[in-house]
C-alpha cells in the first residue's frame, strides 16, 4: 500500500537502510499487515529471516510467533498487535486515503474472523463490540473490500 508522504522525506545515505528496520516498523507496520492478511506465520518468519541482515533466530522467533503474528495463542502477548489505519497515521507521515480504507477493512475483517476468540480478551473485547454494532451494510462492505484486496495481492 503506497501513499505519497505528507512531506518529502530526506533520502537515505546508507544502502543498508533497505535491509534494516526499527523494531516498531517490523512489529506494527510489516507484522501488522501480515497478520491482518492472515499470512502463515512460518512464511512471515521466513520472509523476515531472509530479508533483514540483523535477523537471528533468538530474536525473530519470539518476535514473529509470540508478538507480531500472535501465533503462540497469547502466551507472550496479551493481544494481537493489530491496529486500524489511525495508528499508522499517528505514527507516520501518511495521510488518510484509499490505503486507509483498505487497511481498516482488513482490520475489521480480522476482528470478524476471530470474533469468538477476541471477545473474551479484555484488550480486544471493545473492538469486537464496536464491530458488532456496525450495520450489516458496513460489514458487507468491509468483507468485500478486504477480500478483493487479498485477491489482488495473492
Give, region by region, the residue ranges found by the protein language model.
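C-terminal catalytic domain of photolyase/cryptochrome flavoproteins
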Residues: 16-154
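Single conserved hydrophobic/aromatic residue that forms the stacking wall/gate
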Residues: 1-15, 19
